[in-house]
Amino acid sequence: MSKLKEKREKVAVSIERSSKEEAVELARVQIEKTFGKGSLIKMGESPVGKGIKSISSGSIVLDEALGIGGYPRGRIIEIFGPESSGKTTLTLQAIAEVQKEGGIAAFIDAEHALDPVYAKALGVNVAELWLSQPDTGEQALEIAEHLIRSGGIDLIVVDSVAALTPKLEIDGEMGDSQIGLQARLMSKALRKITGILSKSNTCIMFINQIRMRIGIMFGNPETTTGGNALKFYASLRLEVRKVEQITRSGSSDDVIGNKIRVKIVKNKVAPPFRKVELVIYFGKGISREAGILDAAIKHNLIQKTGSWYSLGDNKLGQGRESVIEYLSKEVELTNDLDKRLRKVIFNNFDQEDVSFIEYKENESE
């Protein structure tokens, strides 16, 4: 008797669900008539339900820390930190990666300070990079909106939020008080941009600067410019800090680069609060080889014994800088390591099945 009752209850639930689905379908038809096709769809039929596409950062260790293999498409990203900490370098490296994949990038240079020589050294095809140097903050953000709506741009970089000066402030006198103008400008622009970003699959990066809050006795006195809107709308927030200077071997005065620390303070697409250290060489950008070496050691593809580094039974060299230099010369080996690491990290590849190309030992030691 209980089985019959249970069967009747299941049939009743099925009928109820069917009637609910019919009601939702009727509502969907009405919604699409009013707002257009695709206004309401099941998540399994939407690109949102099929995972988030990404743009490589140019560093495998940062790609791993970001959780999805790079910067998420269709999202807002904020990169902030003190001066000369590597913020612009990170964005230019991302532009170079987009262009390598055949994508299109734009740089909105509100600071009017983009160095094409440095960008080219980082691998950016400056001849194909779209550049805008707007006069006002409104102009910059409207240009960004038009580019996003075009659907043809893969990556937009805005440098920087602090330089997005409202027109009213530019037209006013130097001593005029213009409290909250920039914050209101950013809030309005981000409300408009957010909805169209996901549909166009465009990634937009905002470079931001740090300011000190007056009168803060306890806690962190640092804050970013442009109000709180960007903090809320950003899916990814990266804090960049300079850790130490890198000097040429055998010299304490010949500085050739910086080591920076990137902390992911907010991440809506993967676990946040991860930290990575990157090496930036002056005139060259982020060291791809240093990132590959760190990742290979972490995932046991390269073994470190004392100051010696080895790949299987073959020694790569003694000392970190020596091995990085060796990997920069052995391009085929470096590319192969990168390929294998990405399989290990992002595809749960069985490390025991990883086989490396033939290569010669580092004979410089």
From Swiss-Prot:
Instruction: List the GO biological process terms.
Output: DNA recombination; DNA repair; SOS response
Can you tell me which residues bind ATP?
Answer: G81, P82, E83, S84, S85, G86, K87, T88
Q: What does this protein do?
A: Can catalyze the hydrolysis of ATP in the presence of single-stranded DNA, the ATP-dependent uptake of single-stranded DNA by duplex DNA, and the ATP-dependent hybridization of homologous single-stranded DNAs. It interacts with LexA causing its activation and leading to its autocatalytic cleavage.
Alphabetical list of SUPFAM superfamilies matching this protein: P-loop containing nucleoside triphosphate hydrolases, RecA protein, C-terminal domain
Species source reads Borreliella afzelii (strain PKo)
- Name the Gene3D superfamilies on file: P-loop containing nucleotide triphosphate hydrolases
What is the name of this protein? Answer: Protein RecA
The disulfide bonds in this chain are none
CC terms in the record's Gene Ontology section: cytosol
Cytoplasm keyword on record: yes
Q: Pfam families under this entry?
A: RecA (PF00154), RecA_C (PF21096)
Which NCBIfam families has this protein been placed in?
tigrfam_recA (TIGR02012)
Hey, which family's this protein in? Belongs to the RecA family.
The subcellular location is: Cytoplasm
Q: Could you state a single Gene Ontology molecular function term?
A: damaged DNA binding
Q: What is its main location?
A: cytoplasm
InterPro entries according to UniProt:
AAA+_ATPase, DNA_recomb/repair_RecA, DNA_recomb/repair_RecA_CS, P-loop_NTPase, RecA-like_C, RecA-like_N, RecA_ATP-bd, RecA_C_sf
**Is the Nucleotide-binding keyword given for this protein?**
yes
- UniProtKB keywords: ATP-binding, Cytoplasm, DNA damage, DNA recombination, DNA repair, DNA-binding, Nucleotide-binding, SOS response
Query: What is the superkingdom listed in this entry's lineage?
Result: Bacteria
